[in-house]
């Protein structure tokens, strides 16, 4: 991240967008910590130059991305006739690839530097995801096996923390904007007419959708496709 920030300043890049994740909020493993540090370096970089606007976007799980849970579950169903989950109470945020791209463009078009853009995205029980995929790809013998949560895993993820909520705004129906908690040489008067968020945290435990909604999201993303014989 530091190398990219330095290169952006050296070559006068107009807009720098750090793509982050919910793992950056109260991180519990090295991956989350590096994402959190990357966010902080990006926001702080706004004080190093006036030529580049440094912005973050923070999202949940992009459906179908490399190593994501959906193709992993589908492969388990097809090869082992089961799905393994760590905890039936676990929830996660999900968005499609097209929604992730929209988040990038939203940040690029509407940021002035220092903000973190968060999509108002749905969340689901991982067990419900397994059920929907089993219903589509499995059979009456396909099982869900609960193997126990790993020490670094969270039951629920958070996109906006309690520390960040006092400086967070509802940008529109689809996006929230977190303003920096450090002093940045930027003006945010364009948010004066926007409502501050009223919740303490934006957690995957609080925005849960049902299996029908998840089915439609998976269809929209092109993940429920019957194979031709």
PLM feature segments, named:
Residues 1-52, 56, 228-229:
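N-terminal Rossmann-like NAD(P)+-binding domain of SDR-like oxidoreductases, especially those catalyzing
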Residues 10, 40-61, 66-229:
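Strand-loop microenvironment adjacent to phosphate/nucleotide-handling motifs in alpha/beta enzyme folds
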């Amino acid at each position: 991240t530091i190398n990219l920030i330095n290169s952006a300043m050296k070559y006068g890049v107009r807009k720098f967008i750090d793509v982050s994740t919910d793992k950056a909020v109260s991180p519990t493993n090295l991956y989350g910590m590096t994402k959190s540090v990357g966010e902080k370096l990006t926001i702080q970089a706004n004080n190093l130059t006036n030529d580049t606007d440094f912005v973050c976007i923070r999202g949940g799980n992009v459906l179908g991305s490399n190593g994501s849970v959906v193709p992993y579950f589908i492969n388990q169903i097809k090869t082992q006739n089961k799905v393994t989950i760590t905890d039936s109470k676990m929830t996660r945020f999900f968005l499609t690839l097209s929604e992730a791209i929209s988040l990038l463009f939203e940040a690029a078009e509407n940021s002035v530097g220092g903000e973190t853009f968060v999509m108002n995205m749905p969340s689901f029980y991982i067990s419900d995801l397994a059920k929907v995929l089993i219903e589509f790809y499995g059979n009456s013998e396909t099982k869900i096996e609960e193997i126990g949560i790993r020490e670094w895993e969270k039951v629920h993820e958070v996109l906006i923390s309690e520390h960040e909520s006092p400086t967070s705004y509802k940008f529109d129906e689809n996006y929230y904007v977190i303003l920096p908690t450090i002093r940045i040489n930027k003006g945010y008067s364009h948010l004066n007419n926007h409502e501050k968020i009223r919740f303490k945290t934006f957690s995957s435990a609080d925005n849960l959708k049902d299996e029908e909604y998840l089915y439609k999201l998976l269809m929209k993303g092109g993940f429920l496709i019957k194979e031709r014989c």
